[in-house]
């Protein structure tokens, strides 16, 4: 397997070879106060690891990207299409394209794994 062209952090397009990385080798970004984000980007999909401080709120929003979310650690109060759901470590959620959703982290640090297709261009540098 190869890391492909460009840098070694998985952030780049044009990969046609398989890649194998570890989260510990992927740079951490800080898109907002209380949020850490790591991204591993492919040609048509991406996976992001988010770490949220307790009680942080992500406002309700929608986007054209299909999204799968895995709760790796903690508990989250999700608001999905006007309904409230509590998700805990081990739970998996699916958000179809243009699904209205948001979340409030509960009383502990939360780690979420989000998979998006197509790529979230708004997350990419440049």
Where are the regions a protein language model picked out?
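A short, N-terminal "cap"/entry segment at the start of jelly-roll beta-barrel domains
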Residues: 1-44, 125
């Amino acid at each position: 397997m190869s890391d492909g062209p460009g840098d070694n952090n998985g952030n780049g397009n044009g990969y046609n070879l398989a890649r194998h990385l570890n989260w510990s080798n992927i740079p951490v970004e800080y898109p907002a106060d209380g949020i850490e984000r790591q991204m591993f980007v492919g040609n048509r999909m991406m996976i992001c690891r988010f770490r949220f401080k307790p009680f942080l709120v992500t406002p309700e929003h929608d986007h054209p990207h299909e999204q799968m979310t895995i709760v790796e650690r903690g508990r989250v109060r999700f608001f999905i299409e006007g309904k409230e759901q509590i998700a805990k470590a081990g739970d998996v959620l699916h958000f179809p394209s243009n699904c209205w959703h948001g979340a409030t982290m509960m009383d502990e640090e939360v780690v979420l794994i989000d998979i998006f297709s197509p790529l979230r261009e708004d997350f990419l540098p440049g």
